[in-house]
Swiss-Prot record:
Pathway: Plant hormone metabolism; auxin biosynthesis
Broad enzyme group: oxidoreductase
Catalytic activity: L-tryptophan + O2 = indole-3-acetamide + CO2 + H2O
UniProt name for this protein: Tryptophan 2-monooxygenase
Name of the gene this protein is made from: iaaM
Entry's family note: Belongs to the tryptophan 2-monooxygenase family.
Length: 562
């Protein structure tokens, strides 16, 4: 996989926002800031809760704008939050990582790639998604080979062709014409935003209250199914659940909202997915140590948990583990949605958020997700011509081999042995010991692919050091992996994302702002963290007397009926 520093050749905005953050951020590099404070205006004292990607970007842009009194509070003992590239052994293998959080990075995430380029962080040519690399699909006990770049195995032809037809051609339901999602992408790329918005609103009108599964049944068992052949219940829908939409099987998230899945396709997040050579944590590290006006964001980090947030005499007070009360003019909360509710108490009353936003904080669905990685003695798949990814309908849903040192074919291997969502992840919570879990997964894999499984022993048989796993549902700082709306919940994303607009209305401005991917339309993607970080920084500047030009506060509008 050839490394390169990539920026999308053709930038386009995401469908729900119709605003591309990259040009604004690029212009800020020319200007030296996203905004500033005129002479005579004292910049505010700001707290940022969470030193993940969102918190660090918000701090970066506020420091560049001239805000000096900033404190980032981080409950973990590390930076990055859920953007976590865990090292197997920093001394012996400093380049070999386990991406415990985000691990796929599409260039259509233009805000993210702006910051990757700013720090010259490289990506590799592709993530080993099914069909992109040599793949094996195991379904009902039968092995199906899928060579890289070719059509899926014959068993999957009907569901594959039907899904592709839907993406390119759309469908006709009860006299309503729905434009193909990839046609909407083309509209965004060619700046036909009014057409794109109209087309997306029709999808929202028809499917806002439908699950992924129920929508697929409606579309593909009707009288005019995309691809021309109706799907058979239940076999074809199980097949499609195993095949997925590009990045592996989606059966565990069939109950998610259909529009939540569709927007990922329209936004291009399922295409050209990249690996970051040093892991996404390199972005957090670079953000933290960059020099800005004689300081760095990292010097403003306080490793302390923020508990309740309250208001006192016009200031916002934070109760922390090490100091009873700290008062600030503005607070940006990038914590996970469940921490916002259960730790900070933001949804208990209307001190900071109105009832609609409080409900969105409380009710937004977060997925459970688990990962288990193994560092192997060598890159056995190269020597033995084994598949680079295995997808199955068993306990071991998705296996991926990850090559972070493509220039060293004789080096150690990294295998993502188990990446699961929702019920599939919940099952694994019963096996808390990572050695037992790893061995159990290898045993399961042995039943379908013994040639592959025989090599799954950690280097030196050291399970303690060379097997890494994490369950996001039981993570005390997260209580879930990422936002994935249920049917009817897109309105929650709308309320959370546009909360920053209160900065334009002093009578609504409580001084507290929400950020993080869980407060975006793209939960689980780093782009949502970037967008909301920039939003919150702009809101702080505007609401405290600063000056902004060409910014999302004035340019991003809520135009859809969710």
């Amino acid at each position: 996989m050839k490394p390169h520093s990539v920026f999308a050749d053709s930038l386009w905005p995401s469908i729900d926002l119709l605003y591309d953050y990259a040009p604004f951020l690029q212009q800020s590099m020319v200007d030296g800031h996203i905004g500033f404070f005129p002479t005579g205006i004292t910049p505010p004292r700001v707290a940022i809760i969470g030193a993940g990607i969102s918190g660090l970007i918000a701090a970066t842009e506020l420091l560049r704008a001239g805000v000096r009194d900033i404190t980032l509070f981080e409950a973990r003992d590390r930076l990055g939050g859920r953007a976590w590239s865990q090292l197997f052994d920093p001394h012996y293998y400093p380049r070999l990582i386990a991406e415990m959080g985000a691990m796929r990075f599409p260039p259509s995430a233009t805000g993210l790639f702006h910051y990757l380029n700013r720090f010259s962080i490289q990506t590799s040519a592709s993530f080993p998604d099914p069909g992109i690399v040599d793949t094996e699909l195991h379904y009902r006990g039968v092995r199906h080979l899928w060579p890289a770049g070719e059509q899926p195995p014959a068993l999957f032809t009907r569901v594959h062709n039907g899904w592709r037809a839907l993406l390119y051609e759309g469908c006709l339901l009860d006299g309503v014409s729905l434009v193909g999602p990839l046609q909407i992408t083309a509209m965004l790329k060619s700046e036909r935003f009014d057409e794109a918005a109209e087309a997306w609103q029709i999808w929202l009108n028809v499917f806002r209250d439908c699950s992924f599964y129920s929508a697929m049944v409606t579309i593909f068992t009707g009288t005019n199914p995309p691809g021309g052949i109706a799907w058979e219940r239940r076999d074809d829908f199980e097949l499609f659940g195993a095949l997925g939409i590009g990045s592996g099987g989606f059966l565990p998230v069939y109950q998610a909202g259909f529009t939540e899945i569709l927007r990922m396709v329209i936004n291009g997040y399922e295409d050209d997915q990249r690996l970051i050579i040093g892991g996404i944590s390199t972005l957090a590290e670079q953000l933290a140590r960059q020099e800005i006006r004689g300081t760095t964001p990292g010097r403003h980090v306080r490793f302390s948990k923020v508990n309740r947030i309250s208001k006192d005499n016009g200031k916002i007070s934070l109760a922390t583990d090490v100091k009873p009360v700290d008062a600030f003019d503005r607070v940006i909360v990038t914590s996970n949605n469940r921490a916002m509710q259960m730790v900070h108490g933001l949804s208990a009353d209307e001190t900071f958020l109105n009832q609609d936003v409080c409900r969105a904080v409380r009710e937004t669905h977060l997925t459970g997700s688990s990962k288990l990685f193994m560092l192997t003695r060598d890159k056995f798949w190269l020597k033995n011509k084994l598949p680079l990814t295995i997808q199955s309908d068993g306990l071991v849903r998705g296996v991926y081999v990850l090559d972070y040192e493509s220039d060293n074919p004789e080096g150690r291997g990294v295998v993502l042995l188990s990446y699961t969502w929702e019920d599939d992840a919940h099952k694994l919570l019963a096996i808390t010991d990572k050695k037992q879990r790893g061995q159990h997964l290898v045993d399961e894999l042995s039943a379908i692919h013994p040639e592959f499984a025989r090599y799954l022993v950690p280097a030196g048989a050291d399970y303690e050091r060379y097997v890494l796993h994490h369950d996001w549902l039981t993570d005390p700082c997260s209580a879930g992996a990422f936002k994935l709306n249920y049917p009817g919940e897109d309105v929650y994303s709308q309320r959370l994302f546009f909360q920053f607009k209160t900065a334009n209305h002093p009578e609504q401005d409580s001084g507290l702002l929400l950020a993080g991917c869980g407060c975006s339309f793209t939960g689980g993607w780093v782009e949502g963290a970037v967008q909301t970080a920039v939003n919150s920084a702009c809101a702080v500047i505007r609401s405290t007397g600063g000056t902004l030009y060409g910014n999302p506060l004035d340019s991003v509008h809520s135009i859809y009926d969710y």
